[in-house]
Amino acid sequence: MAADSEPESEVFEITDFTTASEWERFISKVEEVLNDWKLIGPSLGKPLEKGIFTSGTWEERSDEISFADFRFSVTHHYLVQESPDKERKDEELEDAIPQSMQDLLCMNNDFPPRAHCLVRWYGLREFVVIAPAAHSDAVLSESKCNLLLSSISIALGNTGCQVPLFVQIHHKWRRMYMGECQGPGVRTDFEMVHLRKVPSQYTHLSGLLDIFKSKIGCPLTPLPPVSIAIRLTYVLQDWQQYFWPQQPPDIDALVGGEVGGLEFGKLPFGACEDPISELHLATTWPHLTEGIIVDNDVYSDLDPVQAPHWSVRVRKADNPQCLLGDFVTEFLKICRRKESTDEILGRSTFEEEGREVADITHALSKLTEPAPVPIHKLSVSNMVHTAKKKIRKHRGEESPLNSDVLNTILLFLFPDAVSEKPLDGTTSIDNSIPAPEAGDYTLYNQFKSAPSDSLTYKLALCLCMINFYHGGLKGVAHLWQEFVLEMRFRWENNFLIPGLASGSPDLRCCLLHQKLQMLNCCIERKKARDEGKKTSLSDSTTSAYPGDAGKTGGQLGLDHLRDTEKEKGEVGKSWDSWSDSEEEFFECLSDTEDLKGNGQESGKKGGPKEMANLKPEGRLHQHGKLTLLHNGEPLYIPVTQEPAPMTEDLLEEQSEVLAKLGTSAEGAHLRARMQSACLLSDMESFKAANPGCFLEDFVRWYSPRDYIEEEVTDEKGNVVLKGELSARMKIPSNMWVEAWETAKPVPARRQRRLFDDTREAEKVLHYLAMQKPADLARHLLPCVIHAAVLKVKEEESLENIPSVKKIIKQIIAHSSKVLHFPNPEDKKLEEIILQITTVEAIIARARSLKAKFGTEKCEHEEEKEGLERFVSCLLEQPEVSVTGAGRGHAGRIIHKLFVNAQRAAAVALPEEELKKSGCPEERRQTLVSDFPPPAGRELILRATVPRPAPYSKALPQRMYSVLTKEDFRLAGAFSSDTSFF
């Protein structure tokens, strides 16, 4: 019984072979990726066109897999092509070898100038690469390499994928790949050798042919012919007789008068070093066979001059120093500084002298002014010394800018200062009529900068140049200090600021430009007021405010009236001017109180008989047709105050105040009153000019659409016109009615000023004085970028480079978006400057190449045009073919460049090296050689032979070799028949 029970007690161990190992899971993941990308089964594309590897579109897609805890990235690289016709495709797929094997023999795209390294080495249009995901990871051991190769071989066999699959091994900088491609009964193995030092027997064609033949091991005799493609690359680094001519501008020479002060308005341009560092000449023999050429360790038939194909590429200098880019970059750096002008210069910029006088004046101002201005006031009375005296005081020996430079800049900014007295109105330019040749004149609208002939624009250029060449930040602070003092001097002495458009501030420009325009408006108003006082005191007939009604009546007619009505339709430009101001505009006349009394008593009724007895004042001219409804007197257009000009910050401030009033009835009423200051002023002027008038009379002139006339028949049967106010004018508590009832008959010259030029000018001057250099740079940076873009466009027009035109359009579009924001980000500004520098470098490269190839020295127009096209292609394309190779016009020039460089190198050789070079004949040969030893030797060997057996299918074999000073690489693709071996 015991014996019988023993077998039953035994436990059998069962091995489950369905449990996948890490290796099997890895293979499964590779297959899964290939399936997802639909790389299963045969694929056949169109024959490769010449140059398609460079001109075509390459795309890639990636995924990530892992082998245990080691991560790999899988990337599919492929050339985008149209799929062939379905019928043709089905015919060709029968018994066809994989597409990649056919590509090994294609000669249309040997040595592509820009392509993936595997494309260059093997001529493939599609392939998959498995590489370690982390940059630092590497597959180093031979066993791991073999494991990965086994994995991809199994995955290709299981899926039927005919796309080559590569594995990257060793460190990534070595670019070492092993791979495989499988087809029906065929297989191609991709192998590679990478050495730092090349064995001497493999430096020439004969040695490489030996390797190729031994590798394919063809048993046939004679061996099928081997097709050979050879490329030798020569590098030219020494540009003899073509020194880079660009020199930084000499500011001292400019100030000394050699060039002239106007050079301060021009930005520099160009590279400080040659932006072309090397020229690479590739001499190619695309179709050779083994028997027609000799290249061994003793003799070579490979003469570059006799090569049938030449191509050239240029190597650009890395980040060449460019003047324009440096100028703008340095100016941008000021925006990041935090020091004030006083801190930089180490003294108070606007310190006052004569404290006793200042204190007395301040005391008087307290007595005469009802409310102080809520800013530190630099009033005219406090300016005991003129701005010019202050300039002399502040300009000491320690000043960052010497007097010659400063005077040259100030004369450039203020050309009217050449005469003893600045010109009057002629100093202000009219930007509304740009020069017809200035097609880019309106570019400032897009950049929110300033017109290119304006003072603000010139100031930006001068500050940019001073920052770069004269004192940096201190020089900028010094010039700004002098500029602000000049502004005050002009305000005090009624001298208009040159280089600014007349009229209200242009909100399309930068805020600083608007502030200067506002100051100019103040000077104009002050000047007109002062002249008006003089003429009224002398009883001149050319008074600015004529009181005699009959002198100008009916002169301008109905057209002028319509313009005036349109102008008067705008209501309430300044809330600030409505409030009780400490500044009074009216003159202290003896009958003012009587006038007020009459006005208050009669204002409520609108136009009573008592008002008709008042003397008319402030008439501009008689209206062409209209008469007063009440008494039939002619209607006179009054002299009115102009609305207050405003800058964008004042408009924003006004909007905030109006918004804070809320939506209540009281707030809305107060808002309406604040906005009706201009309307109230015009009503008072109208009442003063037309005693006995009614609201209807005012509306007929001021807003004709609100007075409705219709034809009616009177009692006698006559058709007459009868008019009445519009519906909106009849609304109870109408703002117009309220304003009319409160308006008094006061002419414009006696009214409180809508625009207090004294206060506004002081606010502007205070604003300018408080600007730090960083604030100033922020204001002016749009002008500097604007100037840089104009400079780039000007320089490009001389060269006519298509790619540069495209980049300039991108710069303008980008800048327009960025600069319209109040405080653009530094990163976005740096991007714009980088684009400008890129364009500058491209133009500098074009000029460098034109100088080297001597385009201006060509005697024949055809040769010149051909060279210019050649230079343009060198800038646009990675590699350019030389028409006629060494025998063409461009080829002869390139040959001459190499000859000159060789001769210069031979002269520079020391005697010891000449002695070492051997016999005199060898020395002579070395010196006479037109070209240096090739910097790179590339060979492609191809053959179609049966492998591994004589009866195997004839399949493509290929080996690529590259030899440089640094390394030696062999990349072989060897196909074999897996059915008949």
UniProtKB/Swiss-Prot annotation:
GO cellular component, one term: postsynapse
Descriptive protein name: Rab3 GTPase-activating protein catalytic subunit
Region (Disordered): 532-558, 591-614
Disulfide bridge positions per record: none
Gene Ontology MF term list: GTPase activator activity; guanyl-nucleotide exchange factor activity; small GTPase binding
Main localisation: cytoplasm
Role this protein plays: Catalytic subunit of the Rab3 GTPase-activating (Rab3GAP) complex composed of RAB3GAP1 and RAB3GAP2, which has GTPase-activating protein (GAP) activity towards various Rab3 subfamily members (RAB3A, RAB3B, RAB3C and RAB3D), RAB5A and RAB43, and guanine nucleotide exchange factor (GEF) activity towards RAB18. As part of the Rab3GAP complex, acts as a GAP for Rab3 proteins by converting active RAB3-GTP to the inactive form RAB3-GDP. Rab3 proteins are involved in regulated exocytosis of neurotransmitters and hormones.
The species this protein was found in: Mus musculus
Presence of keyword Coiled coil: no
Keywords carried by this UniProt record: Cytoplasm, Endoplasmic reticulum, Golgi apparatus, GTPase activation, Phosphoprotein
Keyword Phosphoprotein listed: yes
Quaternary data: The Rab3 GTPase-activating complex is a heterodimer composed of Rab3gap1 and Rab3gap2. The Rab3 GTPase-activating complex interacts with DMXL2. Interacts with LMAN1.
Tissues expressing the protein: In the eye, it is highly expressed within the lens, particularly in the anterior lens epithelium and in a ring corresponding to the equatorial region where anterior cells are differentiating into lens fibers. Also highly expressed in the retina.
Subcellular localization: Cytoplasm; Endoplasmic reticulum; Golgi apparatus, cis-Golgi network
Protein family according to the UniProt entry: Belongs to the Rab3-GAP catalytic subunit family.
One Pfam short name: Rab3-GAP_cat_C
UniProt GO BP: establishment of protein localization to endoplasmic reticulum membrane; excitatory postsynaptic potential; lipid droplet organization; positive regulation of autophagosome assembly; positive regulation of endoplasmic reticulum tubular network organization; positive regulation of gene expression; positive regulation of glutamate neurotransmitter secretion in response to membrane depolarization; positive regulation of GTPase activity
Modification type Phosphoserine: residues: S83, S379, S536, S579, S581, S590, S664
